[in-house]
Amino acid sequence: MAEAGTGEPSPSVEGEHGTEYDTLPSDTVSLSDSDSDLSLPGGAEVEALSPMGLPGEEDSGPDEPPSPPSGLLPATVQPFHLRGMSSTFSQRSRDIFDCLEGAARRAPSSVAHTSMSDNGGFKRPLAPSGRSPVEGLGRAHRSPASPRVPPVPDYVAHPERWTKYSLEDVTEVSEQSNQATALAFLGSQSLAAPTDCVSSFNQDPSSCGEGRVIFTKPVRGVEARHERKRVLGKVGEPGRGGLGNPATDRGEGPVELAHLAGPGSPEAEEWGSHHGGLQEVEALSGSVHSGSVPGLPPVETVGFHGSRKRSRDHFRNKSSSPEDPGAEV
């Protein structure tokens, strides 16, 4: 049986498993590449002795049930130990666990108590405080802040820069005193105003309207319409285009612009209402034309005037001739 304190395997165990060195290692055990001279026997046992372990479990094999406890729990914690391994592997494992035990001994008792519970489990570390210990130490060594002194106003520190005004000699005023002061001021202003000033037109409230200027909208369109009606009435009188009229004798009749009136315009309505859309422009007798045959009845020329607006470009002036440049054909 291997001793728990030394960690060295016994000769009896090594002789018992000496024939099993050619077996392959288990998948659950892994070694580094540097351990080329090591071999893991198939019957190697891993043993971890914890404070809760029982003394009867050391002699029991892997297939045998553990024996009932026959004594008290060991007082000290025994290190981790593997049985059935080579001396090199056992030495490495012992060195590793010795370093861990040394680090645990060097740790302060308060840290060990907070990091490990009574049953061997790890506890969650305490949350850090709001300020670090270095910061708190620096604040502790710092001198207490002196009380803040309010700043001195500039008019106290430099009174020569300021001018002091006082209202001690001013009497208390009220609404009645303000009203009396205003009326006295207005009375003095009215007395100082000149009386021989002549107001311009429409400024005197007592005027009767003499000399006023009245602005009204011009009625040029209405007057032009009445004038046009009057001219058309004179043209439409009987006997205007007879033989006694010199204008008719020359073959020239009155020129009317009724065809330029737009639809719905007042001129078109007046033209249609008075003449019914049919206007006699000129009445010429047969003797006026040079090629007329005597004895024929006189011919009357009738012009039809519509209310549709036409462009002036389609009409030729009487003074222009087809031979003139720019004349329309």
Curated annotation (Swiss-Prot):
Keywords: Acetylation, Cytoplasm, mRNA processing, mRNA splicing, Nucleus, Phosphoprotein, Spliceosome
Biased composition (Basic residues): 306-317
Pfam family, one: TSSC4
Chain positions covered by the region annotation Hom4: 201-250
Location of Phosphoserine modifications: 60, 67, 86, 132, 143, 146, 265, 321
Coiled-coil ranges from the UniProt annotation: none
Subcellular location: Nucleus; Cytoplasm
Keyword Zinc on entry: no
Region Hom2: start-end pairs: 77-104
Effect of residue 201 to A: Loss of interaction with SNRNP200. Loss of interaction with PRPF8 and SNRNP200
GO molecular function: molecular sequestering activity; protein-containing complex binding
Residue spans of biased composition, Low complexity class: 22-41
Annotated spans, Interaction with SNRNP200: 149-316
Region (Hom3): 150-186
Known function: Protein associated with the U5 snRNP, during its maturation and its post-splicing recycling and which is required for spliceosomal tri-snRNP complex assembly in the nucleus. Has a molecular sequestering activity and transiently hinders SNRNP200 binding sites for constitutive splicing factors that intervene later during the assembly of the spliceosome and splicing. Together with its molecular sequestering activity, may also function as a molecular adapter and placeholder, coordinating the assembly of the U5 snRNP and its association with the U4/U6 di-snRNP.
Assembly and binders: Interacts in a RNA-independent manner with distinct U5 snRNP-containing complexes, the mono-U5 snRNP and the post-splicing U5 snRNP-PRPF19 complex. Interacts with SNRNP200; the interaction is direct, excludes recruitment of C9ORF78 and WBP4 to SNRNP200 and negatively regulates its RNA helicase activity. Interacts with PRPF8; the interaction is direct.
Name of protein: U5 small nuclear ribonucleoprotein TSSC4
GN (gene name): TSSC4
